[in-house]
């Protein structure tokens, strides 16, 4: 059966169903479902300390919405592929910020002749888990890339390509910078420095 289009789940309008592993080992309300497609949240040079990078650029989302785990993985692979074409793996670090904890449910319906005799319609319509999502809020950072000033043009171009995969309004921003008084005029992006 084909996947339901994501605009059915994009808005945050339902209660959150999270799959948790508690210490008391009590049964959770959400069971089963597929694992997240997104396995790696950090890609690139993970050995270099974060304080040593000269610059950090990222994508900030403009609205409250849910992002599927497939979207986050598509952003990560797109960035990784584009950056490795031009830079070595030691020259950048990609970090995906939100984690897909929310379980997305679907009440599967049959759509063919005589289907009304085989299914129960909206009775017991809670549905089964069919995927995962991350709930993000306005002005939240989705992805962050650490790099040096000499590679900033390549990183900005890769971020613009990856931003199309979000399917929502977003903007590129400078998140961290060494010596902002020297370099702030040379970047050409909104500066939203994080502590």
What are these regions (language model features)?
Residues 1-195:
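Ribosome-associated RNA-binding proteins
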């Amino acid at each position: 059966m084909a996947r339901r289009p994501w605009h059915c789940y994009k808005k945050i309008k339902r209660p959150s169903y999270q799959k948790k592993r508690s210490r008391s080992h009590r049964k959770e309300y959400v069971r089963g479902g597929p694992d997240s497609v997104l396995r790696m949240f950090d890609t690139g040079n993970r050995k270099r300390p974060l304080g040593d990078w000269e610059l950090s650029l990222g994508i900030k989302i403009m609205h409250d919405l849910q992002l599927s785990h497939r979207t986050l993985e598509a952003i990560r692979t797109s960035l990784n592929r584009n950056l490795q074409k031009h830079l070595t793996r030691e020259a950048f670090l990609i970090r995906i910020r939100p984690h897909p904890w929310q379980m997305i449910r679907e009440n599967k319906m049959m759509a063919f002749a005589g289907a009304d005799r085989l299914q129960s319609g909206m009775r017991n319509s809670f549905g089964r888990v069919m995927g995962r999502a991350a709930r993000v809020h306005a002005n939240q950072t989705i992805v962050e890339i650490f790099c040096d000033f000499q590679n900033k043009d390549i990183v900005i171009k890769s971020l613009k390509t990856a931003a199309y995969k979000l399917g929502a309004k977003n903007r590129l921003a400078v998140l961290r910078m060494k010596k902002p008084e020297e370099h702030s005029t040379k970047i050409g992006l909104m500066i939203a420095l994080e502590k």
